Amino acid sequence: TAMQDPASGPDVYMTLGGAKTKDMVDAGQAMDLTDKISDTVKKQMSSALESVSYDGKVYGVPVTVQPGGIWYSKDLFKQAGIDAAPTTFSELKTDVQKLRSAGIDPIALGGKDAWPVGHWYYWLSMRECSPKAYAKGVNDKDFSDSCWTKAGDDLKDLLDANAFNEGFLTTTA
């Protein structure tokens, strides 16, 4: 019955975090959970708590962490003369060239649906930007930190290296 009264709102709700959580905080519709979270969780999950924290207070519980990764074929790497998976962006770019030289599409990407391409920029920006820069983007719509441009430059480097399969923008995920 609480859900039937728009004045009271729900006790528990799900949101995407970031600006959506901030809107709920600003509207007085979110409870400060800071003192209900153990110091261990605060320490070990500080990055995850960033998206639901404002002015040093925690207003949400992250229920998912979405790590990204790259699956690769050891056989294709071997065919291209690559002995190990890259561990740096520089190594990735070098391996892209080796794979391309061996006639292998380095990265298979289905970009027609947009979100897979967006993930590449997201992952690269996570690499370049600090939590503070992310918070300024979410809270203030301030993307003046050079990390955002660096992430775009990194993505352009991959495009210039012909890292993705031919026609990736018209290939479905």
Where are these regions (language model features)?
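Early extracytoplasmic/lumenal segment of secretory-pathway proteins
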Residues: T1-T21, S90, A173
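Extracytoplasmic/periplasmic solute-binding protein
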Residues: D55, Y59-V63, G68, S90-D140
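Short, solvent-exposed loop/beta-turn-alpha elements that line the ligand-binding surface or hinge
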Residues: D32-Q44, I107, G111, E128-K150
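Loop/turn elements at helix/coil->beta-strand transitions in domains of secreted/extracellular proteins
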Residues: P6-D11, K57-V58, R100-P106, A161-F164
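Hinge/lid segment of periplasmic solute-binding proteins
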Residues: L16-G68, K78, S90-T94, W120
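Short aromatic/basic micro-patch
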Residues: W71
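Glycine-centered hinge/linker elements that transmit conformational signals in sensory
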Residues: V96, V138-T172
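Aromatic-glycine-rich donor-binding/catalytic loop that engages nucleotide-sugar donors
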Residues: D75-A85, A163
